[in-house]
UniProtKB/Swiss-Prot annotation:
Belongs to the complex I 49 kDa subunit family. It comes from Dehalococcoides mccartyi (strain CBDB1). This is NADH-quinone oxidoreductase subunit D. Keywords: Cell membrane, Membrane, NAD, Quinone, Translocase, Transport, Ubiquinone. It is found in: Cell membrane. The keyword Transport applies. NDH-1 is composed of 14 different subunits. Subunits NuoB, C, D, E, F, and G constitute the peripheral sector of the complex. It catalyses: a quinone + NADH + 5 H(+)(in) = a quinol + NAD(+) + 4 H(+)(out). Its EC number is 7.1.1.-. Signal peptide: none annotated.
Length: 367
């Protein structure tokens, strides 16, 4: 007599230590093998886009801090750049260099946190995370020097910055740039030579090139699948066209490659930072921008390469001091949409390793 079996539906979350926020995964299992996955989000929805339409352009800057709250500086940059484009505001040379410095520091800090949490998801509880937070703490202290905040910095302004870098910032940054490459090498050696990490990541959770494109994957997730796409190089903004750097690309699109891309990107960020510090000019840090901004009627889309991928802002102005439409293109949500293609066919034990490798923040997914 044939045995009749049924697939098992398993809910992981919405309150689970590995979901990186309040998030639910609804998975269908055939034994231990995943046959289907549905990400269920919205638990952290705050209505940021609608709230922003009821406030002035300046009052909306703090909302950007609370999207990917591990990438606040780059979020600020993407938004103020969109408003500057809409209003025709010019940014001074020194301010552009400072923006590059802060963006690349934010990229390193975000990758350090992402890799630490990824290893937590693999089962290497706390120790690697604390190693990486040791270096991230030095970057957070630099952000604290210039903004007065350790999180949600609210430092960028239309036309530049409200205040210049403090005197102690650059000496502390130079010390960090001297020591950080050695620690990145240490992290790579500890992780890439660990047999358990290799077994659980190499060839696991592959996102093929065509699926990465079709799902609009972004950032390290996209480049790990062999797509040479980075806004800093493909559509340069700010002054990124003045710097020499490489775009790390992998070819397998597996969990290991997504980890490795972030290691390589941190090295490139250090190289960009050294060039920016060396060439940082003197001068004004704030362009001419009215205190009450009323951009002419029109629309604009502006994008940057954030730590998680292409972050864009679409703004519509009706000529008043408040945006008529305020829309975010969130890379975390786009990468999350590719998760099903990565996990189907793998065992439920591999799910969190694959999920951790895409490095999402639910504040940006739900908004």
């Amino acid at each position: 007599m044939a045995i009749k079996t049924e697939n098992f539906i398993l809910n992981i979350g919405p309150q689970h230590p590995s979901t990186h926020g309040v998030f639910r995964l609804r998975i269908v299992l055939d034994g231990e093998v995943i046959t289907d996955l549905e990400p269920v989000f919205g638990y952290l929805h705050r209505g940021i886009e609608k709230l922003a339409e009821g406030r002035t352009y300046l009052q909306d800057i703090p909302f950007t801090d609370r999207l990917d709250y591990l990438g606040s500086m780059t979020n600020n940059h993407a938004y103020v750049m969109a408003v500057e484009k809409l209003a025709g505001i010019t940014v001074p040379e020194r301010a552009e260099y400072i923006r590059v410095i802060l963006d690349e520091l934010q990229r390193i800090a975000s990758h350090l946190a992402g890799l630490g949490f990824f290893l937590n998801d693999l089962g290497a509880l706390q120790t690697p995370l604390l190693y990486m937070f040791r270096e991230r703490e030095k970057i957070v202290e630099l952000f604290d020097m210039c903004s007065g905040q350790r999180l949600n910095y609210n430092y960028y302004r239309f036309g530049g910055f409200v205040q210049d870098l403090p005197e102690e910032f650059l000496p502390a940054l130079k010390i960090l740039l001297d020591t950080l490459p050695g620690f990145i090498d240490e992290y790579e050696q500890l992780i890439s030579t660990n047999e358990i990490v290799l077994i659980r990541t190499k060839g696991v959770g592959v996102l093929k090139r065509d699926l990465a494109i079709n799902s609009s994957a972004a950032g390290p997730v996209l480049r790990a699948s062999g797509i040479n796409w980075d806004i800093r190089r493909n559509d340069p903004y700010s002054i990124y066209n003045r710097f020499e750097f490489d775009i790390p690309i992998a070819k397998n699109g597996d969990t290991y490659d997504r980890y490795m891309i972030r290691i390589l990107e941190m090295r490139q960020s250090v190289w960009i930072l050294r060039q920016a510090v060396k060439d940082l000019p003197e001068g004004e840090i704030m362009g001419k921008a009215p205190k009450l901004l009323k951009p002419p009627a029109g629309e604009v889309y502006s994008r940057i390469e954030g730590p998680k991928g292409e972050l864009g802002f679409y703004l519509v102005s009706d000529g008043t001091d408040k945006p008529y439409r305020w829309r975010v293109r969130p890379p975390c949500l786009l990468n999350l949409s590719a998760l099903k293609d990565m996990v189907v066919g793998w065992k439920v034990a591999d799910l969190m390793a694959i999920f951790g490798s895409i490095d999402i923040v639910m504040g940006e997914v739900d908004r």
